[in-house]
């Protein structure tokens, strides 16, 4: 039986991690369950409530977003200022049977970078924190 933990705040998230008696799988939008290094665990820690832009300073090229923020939302916001993600995350939605390209956290967790990484760098080079 799968146990789903879905904290709604950073304090609740910290408590889930602190109280964990066994490993859990992290999940944002759940679009890349087979990519990266999947954890086999009956516990799922959902980050679905951690969405949206926290900080966006286009002049400084700074963006902070919740782990489950859809890539489409981030790309739309950046496009309004003629900006884009330098590492060009690939969209595996149709390959993985999803209707969404996924979330920022999923791209970072799976280490996904597209063809622009040659000039712009991989996603870890653009992520702090």
Stretches with model-predicted labels:
Residues 1-24, 47-100, 108, 112-129:
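N-terminal glycine-rich flavin-associated loop
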Residues 25-32:
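Glycine-rich beta-strand-to-loop/alpha-helix junction loops that act as flexible
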Residues 33-39:
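Short glycine-biased active-site loop of nucleotidyltransferases that positions the nucleotide triphosphate
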Residues 40-45:
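Short, well-ordered secondary-structure micro-motifs within conserved domains or adaptor modules
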Residues 105:
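ATP-binding N-lobe of GHMP and related small-molecule kinases
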């Amino acid at each position: 039986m799968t146990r789903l933990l879905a904290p709604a705040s950073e304090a609740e998230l910290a408590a889930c991690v602190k109280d964990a008696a066994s490993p859990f799988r992290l999940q944002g939008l759940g679009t890349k369950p087979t990519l990266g290094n999947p954890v086999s665990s009956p516990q799922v820690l959902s980050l679905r409530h951690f969405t949206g832009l926290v900080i966006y300073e286009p002049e400084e090229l700074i963006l902070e977003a919740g782990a489950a923020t859809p890539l489409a939302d981030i790309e739309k916001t950046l496009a309004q200022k003629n900006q884009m993600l330098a590492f060009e995350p690939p969209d595996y939605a149709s390959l993985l049977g999803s209707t969404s390209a996924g979330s920022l956290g999923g791209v970072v967790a799976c280490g996904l970078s597209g063809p622009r990484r040659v000039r712009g760098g991989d996603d870890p080079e653009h992520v702090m924190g």
